[in-house]
A protein has these predicted regions:
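Short, small-residue-biased leader/transition segments that mark boundaries at the very start
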Residues: 2-13
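Extracytosolic ligand-binding ectodomains
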Residues: 11-411
Length: 411
């Protein structure tokens, strides 16, 4: 019976793969026909070509806890491609074309020198899959004065505040936006007593700082704050160490800051008291998730899966938004000059649909994209913030993250 069941599952998996390949083939044929029609009709009418650089840095592969999640070396790539396709849908009718060049700087190469070469070659628009330190260095280069960097990965709050730059805008949400989104939901559920567990990494501390600010902002009590500093292999010791680590605290919910996933997954079902896990594990605030299906998101999920063969990640989504932002601005102002594009991006008239029920737009005081934040469990969508009842004189989306009066950014 086991062999029959196993064979049945194998056949089902093969059929699913076959169906996926067939749909992908149909999509490619349809795209080729559209491209052929478009090139025949509009090739002679191209009046404006916008060049975009997608720049990323090769990373050393980190140690993983399991092999369940694949290590991706193409994050952002397929999001960029979908963004270009969507831009061309309107662009061809307007005589606009978009070309993207993918640049991955190797471990041995100097990122700053490679970036300077690209600027010298005449490129203006850069979609950047880089960390906070790299973004800060590139935006501070004297050669970077007349370019636009679009951040699709880093959540670091300082890049939106004291270290903000007029040549750097952010599609990726900040730590404060994510923590505010989560906190609003926890307040709604009346889970107001937190046990905060913080990892040892720099990113963990940055996320924890944002969580503490959100707790203060929404009148949450952090009953206990502990740093996870165990070096043992949790696959063998979790059942012994975690109950002792979490014992003796009166709390409603455990909030975890473990950005690299070094220990957070082991906390569930092992705490001394039966409590839910939220934060970087468990119920997680994010700008995109594979379970998101509302507001036409299913269409985007299916398009991405057929193109890439995998689920869309937050970085993939941010890459798509970044390219769409440029395309929308070029279409509206009928120009691709930097000054014209930036003026429109920060104007009240700018906004694009992004499969989240409302148009997303940029905050003109720090260059951050205001957007709804999804609250997702590993296999289900739970809620979307801002939560009902949180009001703002300009936009309810500005209840998430640093508002203009609080901002230390000076553009």
């Amino acid at each position: 019976r086991d062999r029959v069941a196993s064979r049945g599952l194998g056949d089902l998996y093969k059929r699913q793969i076959q169906q996926l390949e067939e749909r992908k083939k149909i999509d490619l044929e349809r795209k080729k026909k559209r491209d052929d029609r478009g090139s025949k009709k509009f090739a002679k009418d191209i009046k404006l070509t916008t060049d975009i650089i997608f720049i990323t840095k090769e990373r050393e592969v980190p140690a993983v806890l399991s092999n369940l999640d694949p290590i991706l070396n193409d994050e952002g790539f397929y999001g960029i491609q979908l963004g270009v396709e969507d831009n061309l849908t309107t662009g061809r009718f307007l005589g606009h074309d978009y070309k993207v060049k993918m640049i991955q700087v190797s471990l041995k190469e100097d990122l700053e020198e490679e970036f300077k070469k690209l600027i010298k070659s005449g490129y203006t628009y850069f979609v950047a899959d880089l960390n906070s330190g790299e973004l800060s260095k590139l935006s501070n280069l004297k050669e970077s004065k007349n370019i636009l960097l679009i951040n699709i990965r880093s959540k670091e709050d300082s890049l939106r505040n004291e270290f903000c730059k007029t040549n750097l805008i952010h599609v990726a949400p900040s730590y404060t936006m994510l923590s505010d989104a989560l906190t609003q939901y926890l307040v709604k559920k009346k889970w107001k007593k937190w046990f905060l567990v913080i990892g040892p990494e720099k990113e963990d501390k940055a996320y924890a700082d944002a969580l503490k600010k959100s707790a203060k902002k929404f009148n949450i009590k952090i009953k206990e704050e502990r740093v996870w500093d165990f070096a043992s292999d949790l696959r063998r010791t979790a059942q012994k160490e975690i109950p002792i680590f979490t014992k003796g605290v009166n709390y409603d919910i455990m909030v975890v800051a473990d950005e690299k996933g070094e220990f957070g997954e082991y906390l569930s079902y092992r705490t001394w008291d039966p409590r839910l896990i939220v934060g970087s594990q468990g119920l997680k605030p994010t700008n995109w998730h594979r379970t998101h299906e509302q507001w036409g998101a299913t269409q985007m999920q299916n398009r991405f899966r057929r193109k890439s063969g995998r689920w869309m990640t937050p970085v993939d989504y941010s890459a798509w938004v970044a390219v769409r932002v440029i395309g929308e601005a070029v279409s509206r102002v009928q120009d691709n000059k930097l000054q014209s594009i930036k003026e429109y991006l920060f104007s009240e008239g700018f906004g694009i649909g992004a499969y989240k029920g409302v148009k997303v737009s940029f905050r003109n005081w720090n260059g951050q994209l205001r957007q709804p934040i999804l609250l997702a469990a590993p296999r289900s969508m739970v809620s979307v913030s801002p939560q009902e009842g949180y009001l703002h004189p300009t936009s309810e989306l500005d209840t998430l993250g640093v508002d203009e009066p609080e901002s230390s950014c000076i553009f």
